[in-house]
UniProtKB/Swiss-Prot annotation:
Natural source organism: Ureaplasma parvum serovar 3 (strain ATCC 27815 / 27 / NCTC 11736)
Record GO terms (molecular function): ATP binding; ATP hydrolysis activity; ATP-dependent peptidase activity; sequence-specific DNA binding; serine-type endopeptidase activity
Lineage: superkingdom: Bacteria
Residues covered by the Lon proteolytic domain: 605-790
Catalysed conversion reaction: Hydrolysis of proteins in presence of ATP
Keywords: ATP-binding, Cytoplasm, Hydrolase, Nucleotide-binding, Protease, Serine protease, Stress response
Annotated protein name in UniProt: Lon protease
Entry-linked CDD domains: RecA-like_Lon (cd19500)
Length: 791
């Protein structure tokens, strides 16, 4: 059932409480008008957190709980709104599907879903009500305070008595509503059953009794007789403990809080804590001992457990033996020399300066190239505790900084949780998938990460739950990401980015031989001489059954072959596997099925209008044939582009065509026979099911257009890549290593690259560079001379 909601400022109505509310805001007036039309005259009153806000738009600006009330009378103040008298019925939650307040009416559900009391609970509530009555009776006799309603409350039934006692007496001296009063009333409404409601009201009345210094003179005197006058704090604690013990005895559940407090105090004394943390821990322990409800004590104990379980001074011992670290990394990971060298640099500096702040390294590369496993191996090599936090899909800032203790079920953020798990202040902390964080109305987690990853700030990292500054300066942070462009710029500025490119076929083969097969054989309890994978067999699997940048699919395919082999062995009647069985193409096809992938190969025959371009893909690189044809059968002047090309590549076609038109005579096109107004040009890039984008095909498209219009073929052993400018300059491109390797694999032995990409050739394996001719060009004139000869 839906009810209108009325958003109030600093007004929280308790059940059975009658109060008058002035209504003036437009949405509030709409809610009253809607409630007037209903037979029940019921409306939900819920208070906003910030009383200075004029218009509330989101539910997170409201308190979590409200009150269903019945409107008893309405006075129309005309232009100034309404004055309404309401009576509280029950505490309710609003069911909202959206975070934005976009309606007047909403569904609701009761906070107390089962109002029926057991006999045990009724006995306990009677005892609590007796204590409430004693407190009210003593307070009403205090010389500075006069309560006229106290005697009227005595005759009420027990549920009304407790609620109205709270409504009457939980306030300030001058009866004005304060922030604390609002929070106290909200706390009462949040209780899920009547027993907890009564316990909470008793607890709050105790606080009022102490905070307003209205303890009865006789009680003061009794306590003073028992305890020395110099220990007023102990007097107060003793009084509250004794009162609470009476209630607990009636509930039949005396807790072991004293035992827990002794253990916590001993732990505080044993640990080496910073002075501010120790002081905070002792203060919270005092609150724990004096807590009036089991709910409050459990919250405080949970906080103390987190505070004391965090490593504040405990430090692990790092392995500073450079040679052993290098050996460990080489044994576990093939290649990736840049990362290994950076780790050794850090260790060398750490040996000179033990107080050196840890580096913040971000490994960027395609999925499956070993980023996470490499960080794990680094932690093992350095003898560091390892903590991993996955940031993929994190969209709430509180996931990083934690929730404030005022929230129900509050917990620290992932950083503090990770440090607790590590148990030392100098672990290796992996922030996995840092490029996958997103932001929404709950905050930007990337902004919270700025403090974590800034060496100048993370010495004083602040978690909303812990509330004490925590030193992260000794942590060695490492991060991983798939896409550099998706990392927020402010974070990139704090990271040392090392890019991991996709593995070449040869690197995949070596990884399979050195790591994957060894692990697979070990898991299968298989001897290495039972099944032999030759280099040719591994190359066949890599080229025809995987298409990836890393080696995850290769690992799965190798495991599939081994499992099939073992099953076949058990089917053998003799149950004996042959020794030295070599895996060949026939066996691979038998176990893995027909070939799944094939890389593009160069054309064997030369045809005008076809040029080998070069593509950089998520799985490495590939040859990218560019096809151009022209005809005079159409209207003329039309350009057709096919092959699933994205915006940038379409623009490359336009730039290439514009450049060719402006320089047709220069590049051997007979403009007397070929009129651009009379011909239609068709540019096509095969594999139309795959989207293609980027400017790097510019010179290949230009060459294909010239080849088609001049009817001069381009040799198939040549491929090219580079951006074309309107003035003919050749621009820099990316993915040089992957493109060169894929072209070489396809049979190309001559490659044209922009001169600005020369620096990236050092990443290409030497055996390829020794067997291929690289042309470095600055202007398209040089490309034309290489392809068609001197003009």
């Amino acid at each position: 059932m839906k009810k209108p909601i009325l958003i109030s400022r600093a007004i929280v109505v308790l059940p059975y409480e009658t109060t008058t509310i002035e209504v003036g805001r437009p949405k509030s007036i709409q809610a009253i008008d809607l409630a007037k039309q209903s037979s029940s005259k019921e409306i939900i009153i819920i208070s906003q957190k910030d009383i200075d806000t004029d218009e509330v738009v989101n539910f997170d600006e409201l308190y979590k709980v409200g009150t269903l009330v019945k409107i008893k009378s309405i006075i129309d103040n005309f232009d100034e709104g309404y004055s309404i008298e309401v009576e509280g019925l029950k505490a309710v939650y609003i069911n909202n599907e959206n975070d934005v307040i976009d309606a007047i009416e909403y569904e609701y559900e009761d906070v107390i879903t089962n109002p029926i009391l057991s006999n045990k609970d009724e006995i306990a509530i009677n005892g609590i009500n007796s204590e409430i009555f004693n407190i009210i009776n003593k307070r009403s006799r205090h010389k500075n305070i006069n309560f006229d309603n106290m005697h009227a409350l005595i005759s009420l039934e027990k549920e009304k008595f407790a609620y109205l006692a709270a409504a009457t007496y939980i306030n300030d001296y001058d009866n004005e509503i304060s922030e604390k009063t609002i929070e106290d009333r909200i706390n009462i409404l949040l209780q899920p059953n009547l027993l907890l409601v009564h316990e909470t009201i008793l607890h709050l009345l105790f606080d009022q009794l102490v905070d307003k210094r209205v303890i009865e003179d006789e009680v003061e005197k009794t306590i003073t007789d028992k305890i020395n006058n110099n220990f007023q704090k102990q007097q107060r604690e003793f009084y509250l403990r004794e009162k609470l013990k009476v209630v607990k005895e009636q509930l039949g559940e005396l807790s072991s809080r004293e035992e827990d407090a002794d253990k916590i105090r001993a732990k505080i004394e044993d640990l080496e804590l910073p002075p501010n943390v120790k002081e905070r821990a002792l203060a919270e322990l005092n609150r724990f001992e004096n807590a009036m409800s089991s709910n409050e004590s459990s919250v405080i104990k949970s906080y103390l457990d987190w505070l004391l379980d965090l490593p504040w001074t405990q430090q692990g011992v790092d392995n500073t033996d450079l040679m052993s670290v290098r050996t460990h990394l080489d044994d576990n990971h093939y290649g990736i020399e840049k990362v290994k060298e950076r780790i050794l640099e850090y260790l060398a500096l750490r040996m000179r300066n033990p107080n050196l702040k840890g580096p913040i390294i971000c490994l960027v590369g395609p999925p499956g190239v070993g980023k996470t496993s490499l960080v794990t191996s680094i932690a093992q090599a350095l003898n560091k505790k390892f903590v991993k936090v996955s940031l993929g899909g994190v969209r709430d800032e509180s996931e990083i900084r934690g929730h404030r203790k005022t929230y129900v079920g509050a917990m620290p953020g992932r950083i503090i949780k990770g440090m607790k798990k590590a148990g030392v202040i100098n672990p290796l902390f992996l922030l996995d998938e840092i490029d996958k964080m997103t932001s929404d109305q709950r905050g930007d987690p990337a902004a919270a990460m700025l403090e974590v990853l800034d060496p100048e700030q993370n010495k004083n990292f602040s978690d909303n739950y812990i509330e004490e500054e925590y030193d992260l300066s000794k942590v060695m942070f490492m991060a991983t990401a798939n896409y550099y462009q998706q990392i927020p710029y402010a974070l990139i500025d704090r990271l040392e980015v090392i890019e991991l490119s996709s593995y070449t076929a040869i690197e995949k083969r070596e990884i399979a031989k050195s790591h994957l097969l060894k692990r697979i054989f070990m898991d299968a309890k298989l001897n290495e001489n039972e099944l032999i994978f030759t280099d040719d067999a591994l190359d066949f699997i890599i080229n025809h059954y995987t298409k990836e940048a890393g080696v995850r699919e290769l690992d799965r395919q190798l495991g599939h072959i081994v499992r099939k082999y073992i099953v076949e062995t058990y089917k053998n009647k003799n149950n004996q596997s042959p020794l030295n069985l070599k895996v060949d193409e026939a066996m691979i096809i038998k176990y893995l099925g027909k070939i799944k992938f094939d890389f593009n190969k160069k054309e064997e025959t030369t045809i005008p209008g076809i040029v080998n371009g070069m593509a950089y893909t998520a799985a490495g690189g590939d040859l990218l044939p560019i096809e151009v044809n022209h005809s005079t059968n159409g209207k003329g002047g039309n350009v057709t582009i096919t092959g699933n090309l994205e915006k940038t590549m379409n623009e490359s076609v336009s730039v290439a065509l514009g450049f060719v038109k402006a320089n047709a005579d220069k590049y051997g096109i007979d403009t007397k026979k070929v009129s651009f107004k009379e011909i239609d040009i068709h540019v096509h890039v095969p594999s139309g099911g795959i989207p293609k984008d980027g400017p790097s095909a510019g010179i290949a498209i230009t060459t294909a257009i010239i080849s088609s219009l001049s009817q001069r073929p381009v040799r198939t052993t040549l491929s090219m890549t580079g951006e074309i400018m309107l003035r003919g300059n050749v621009g820099i491109i990316g993915g040089v290593k992957e493109k060169v390797i894929s072209a070489y694999r396809a049979g190309v032995r001559e490659i044209i690259l922009p001169i600005d990409d020369e620096r990236y050739l050092e990443d290409v394996p030497k055996y390829i560079l020794d067997d291929i001719k690289i042309h470095l060009v600055k202007h398209y004139d040089e490309v034309y001379n290489i392809v068609f000869g001197e003009k």
